[in-house]
Amino acid sequence: MTAPSKPVLVADIGGTNARFALADVDASVPLLDDTSREFAVVDFTSLGEAARYYLDQIGVQATQGVFAVAGRVDGDEARITNHPWVISRSRTASMLGFSTLHLINDFAAQAMAISLLRPQDVVQVGGASWRPAPIDQPRNYGVIGPGTGLGVGGLIIRHGRCFPLETEGGHVSFPPGTPEEIRILEILSEQFGRVSNERLICGPGLVNIHRALSEIAGVDPGPLQPKDITARAAAGDPRSSRTIDLFCAIFGAIAGDMVLMQGAWDGVFLTGGLVPKVLDSLQHSGFRQRFEHKGRFSAIMSRVPSLAVMHPHAGLLGAAAYAVDAQRQPPGEQR
């Protein structure tokens, strides 16, 4: 490995694992994939300790960093639910001897990754074909991703700069679109009170949909995990298959609503841990029909691309993109 002259340490910090890599902001492909490493969070007492261990392992000293964290960034600190680390930007920068350290939300990183995605990093799920655009062309993109929760964000590109939209769109109220979905909403309302999109479109959401369908059928499904539902659907179980179909259709409806709310006419990127697992279902389900079914805007919506992100390290890619964009920032400008 040949280290760049001014390496930037990038990280993607989740609840269980921490991923690190180096980025070269002057390279045409900034993320140096061969430098990526993954460590268990529980093996280190702090983010700084994990980052120092990584740098020592690869024998490189960086002075700048961009760390994406799966939680809310509030000033100097980032908080991740049920996480052993208290993440402080200033303390971590001091421990590592960094002159600059950015903490960003993990979904801001997913949005920033769009600016570096290549055609081979995505799979078309419908709409017009997509090609990466030069950074000086204005673009509005949406990004939505089911995992343990539902992340929703966007990316605005203007005048050669990238501006991620950090939202809590996963917590918007769920809008049922069919009588069956109305009944599911009624059942989930009895359990949760208010029902957000995240109650259905995420890993636990698969279980919620399946349990609601089981209640409608008058049966008890017993203990379930999301992986049980996808496995049963693959084996031909009708209720599990219907769960996946509903998941994809509702996902499409919500993604389409996001386009209308954000003006994300240039494309929607589907990310998160569940997307690769249900990709075939997304391509052969009601996802696009519900995505496009927006009344007077249906014709326009039919042209909006929806793309599944298949890059194995999209969070690291987004952190690298943030580092690249920071180099374009005029002196004294605040994000």
UniProtKB/Swiss-Prot annotation:
Alphabetized InterPro entries for the sequence: ATPase_NBD, Bacterial_glucokinase, Glucokinase
Main subcellular location of this protein, as a coarse class: cytoplasm
Keywords: ATP-binding, Cytoplasm, Glycolysis, Kinase, Nucleotide-binding, Transferase
GO process terms (BP): glycolytic process
GO cellular component: cytosol
EC number(s) reported in the record: 2.7.1.2
Keyword ATP-binding listed: yes
Compartments in which it is found: Cytoplasm
Pfam families for this protein: Glucokinase (PF02685)
Residues that coordinate or bind ATP: A11, D12, I13, G14, G15, T16
Catalysed reaction equations from the record: D-glucose + ATP = D-glucose 6-phosphate + ADP + H(+)
Record GO terms (molecular function): ATP binding; D-glucose binding; glucokinase activity
Entry keyword annotation includes Heme: no
HAMAP family: Glucokinase
Family the UniProt entry places it in: Belongs to the bacterial glucokinase family.
Protein name as it appears in the record: Glucokinase
